[in-house]
Amino acid sequence: MNKDVSLGQPIVRYEDGKLFNTTDQYVTEFPLTIMVNGEEFATVICSPTNLEELVIGFLASEGAILKRDELKSVLIDDSKGFAHVGLNKDLGDRFQYSTKRMIASCCGKSREFYFQNDAAIAKTSMSKITLTPIQIINMMTRLQSASHIYQETGGLHNAAISDGLTFFVHRQDIGRHNALDKLYGFCIQRHITVRDKVLIFSGRISSEILIKAAKIGVGVILSKSAPTTLAVTLANDLNITAVGFIRNGGFNIYSHPERIIDSEQ
């Protein structure tokens, strides 16, 4: 299997009143079927990088695992598109209907699944982190400058975790949920505590993205785009600071503004 996140392909382009042949970068879509204790759990459409992190983060987001010690083994067979996961426990009855679900790269889950499972295991943030406006603007600038494949293709979501100064991890994926799951998996693998960390994200803060941030455990989420009304409601309920429209030296704070302090004070 070719593990390139993007590939050059021939296209016909129209520009300045003319049609001409050229090449363009396409992002790669890769179906990964996750097998848990020998049973098919889900198929995720993703970018073919950091797949072990993706699998671990995805299982944690689904509530199938709570910590690294519950994993017995994770074997990635990227030539066939399978991830074989062994757990030190049974999944239980609540995951029976999850079998053979397809998680598309561009779409969230159904509203029913989201409310029954996702919201139930989201954590209320106890984060005590504070940030200055300059830190917020600098982190978003750094995320965008690090996203060279997005600049080439326009087709990937980017996300990072930071303490306000240092990026601990930066990941990209064709699916916005996958990008966050890769961060989550990275932190679980390395036992990184994220309570006083920041999630920086390139996409819109939807309710599902906000729930994902709550599962990861961060207290602040930053985005260059706007949140939805339900995302802001959830952010207030879960004690998460949501900051959006970070661009041109400004931003909007939608929930829990007490974590953002004036650098002039």
Curated annotation (Swiss-Prot):
One of its GO terms (cellular component) is cytoplasm. InterPro entries: Cytidine_deaminase-like, FdhD. GO terms for molecular function: sulfur carrier activity; sulfurtransferase activity. Keywords: Cytoplasm, Molybdenum cofactor biosynthesis. The active site is at 107 (cysteine persulfide intermediate). Its main location: cytoplasm. GO terms for biological process: Mo-molybdopterin cofactor biosynthetic process. Disulfide bonds: none annotated. It is found in: Cytoplasm. Belongs to the FdhD family. Required for formate dehydrogenase (FDH) activity. Acts as a sulfur carrier protein that transfers sulfur from IscS to the molybdenum cofactor prior to its insertion into FDH. This is Sulfur carrier protein FdhD. The lineage of its organism: Bacteria, Bacillati, Bacillota, Bacilli, Bacillales.
